[in-house]
């Protein structure tokens, strides 16, 4: 056995050297997520994305992201009737550090949907595909339950199949008429107020009393060709030649000079 110093061990060796630790967040930027002007809360949060490097543009990675927000947070309301509705917003364009979103769907929370399903009643559901006046093809799911008559002594309140078919047909007609005559912005306002479900419940009372009638889910199947001007109208942004309007968190419009660049932050 040779006696002496091992030069490789004394220097640490090639594999044993310490690697430089780089914070991954130093390569990322924060962007503000903006909701359309049909909601009271304009800034719904922030999102992270890798900074633009070469051909990797940050805005391309932001477009298409889907954000799910409770209706109570969007409308600044503590009403329990709004808290179980979830709206999905999709990022369609990026202006400076603002991600402009549009409506992408609606759904009920799982706990609300499961709490409505009970024994001794009939569940009636209708699935309708309708097109808005501005070219959005939607698939709408409506749900309702039969209600027990106060004067009845029966434990159950089951509806006959003929009554179920009539109620489902009535649901389909009302949803088709309500959707086809309005644009997407007006339809979102109706979904927020739940006016379509209330009309269905009132119209079906003659066939069989209903309760817990809701628009359970809304899916966007097809969209018209993307138009920046229409999206900017939803965000109170006209877009001039000399100035560029940026939507603030409160919904006001701030004019900034053309070519404005936000200051670079030293730390994130």
UniProtKB/Swiss-Prot annotation:
PANTHER family: 40S RIBOSOMAL PROTEIN S3A
Disordered: region residues: 1-21
Keywords of the record: Cytoplasm, Developmental protein, Differentiation, Oogenesis, Ribonucleoprotein, Ribosomal protein
Main function: Essential for oogenesis; required for late follicle cell development.
Assigned protein family: Belongs to the eukaryotic ribosomal protein eS1 family.
Annotated protein name in UniProt: Small ribosomal subunit protein eS1
Family annotation (Pfam families): Ribosomal_S3Ae
Keyword Transcription regulation: no
CC annotations in GO: cytosolic small ribosomal subunit
Database matches in InterPro entries: Ribosomal_eS1 (IPR001593), Ribosomal_eS1_CS (IPR018281), Ribosomal_eS1_euk (IPR027500)
Main location: cytoplasm
Gene Ontology MF term list: structural constituent of ribosome
Assembly information from the UniProt record: Component of the small ribosomal subunit. Mature ribosomes consist of a small (40S) and a large (60S) subunit. The 40S subunit contains about 33 different proteins and 1 molecule of RNA (18S). The 60S subunit contains about 49 different proteins and 3 molecules of RNA (28S, 5.8S and 5S).
GO biological process: oogenesis; translation
Protein species of origin: Drosophila grimshawi
Compartment(s): Cytoplasm
Keyword Amino-acid biosynthesis listed: no
